[in-house]
Amino acid sequence: MKNFVAIDFETANYEPTSICSVGLVVARGGEITQRMHRLVCPEPDYYIRRFSEQVHGIYPADTCGAPTFDAVWSEIVPWVEGLPFVAYNKAFDERVLRAACRMYGIDYTYGTFLCTLRQARRVIPRTSIANYRLPTVCAYLGIPFDRHHYALADAEGCARIALRLWGDEE
């Protein structure tokens, strides 16, 4: 697979609609061609302190005045038209995307959504790796990675994993 959009969301709280950050990395022809990161005003607009302090480092002041997801999505759509999504742990990111689209009345018609975590578990023997966390899989595959839970870094790590594990597939 050489053409896709890697996507990663960070949320402010346990609600899947509470997107506070989105990262996208577009691959075409087996090369990364575009990157996008946006802060998003979450809905509902409250933060769980642990998420801010221990997970993504995004605080209410960071998203005060940021656009809501529907405005950000209108900017994203031209990038994703006709391309499959990939995510590391797609169960989370697809649930977040579907919930936000439902909440904002956005027609969600993007069918293919693949999981690089699932593919890593299929391809990398359990005895060869300490765990299947995103930073660990990147390290195992020799992919530079830092700033875990920064949406753009996670999307880029996911994209590079997809290119490595599915790169020869059409």
Where are the predicted features?
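Conserved non-catalytic scaffold segment of RNase H-like nuclease domains
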Residues: M1-Y104, Y108-Y110, N131-H149
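Short Asp/Glu-rich motifs
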Residues: V72, A120, G157-C158
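Amphipathic alpha-helical interaction segments
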Residues: R95-V96, G157-R160
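Short alpha-helix plus adjacent loop in nuclease-associated cores
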Residues: L114-N131
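Acidic two-metal-ion nuclease catalytic site recognized across multiple nuclease folds
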Residues: A139-Y140, A159-E170
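Short, conserved phosphate/pyrophosphate- and ester-handling motifs at nucleotide-, phospho-/glycolipid
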Residues: D154
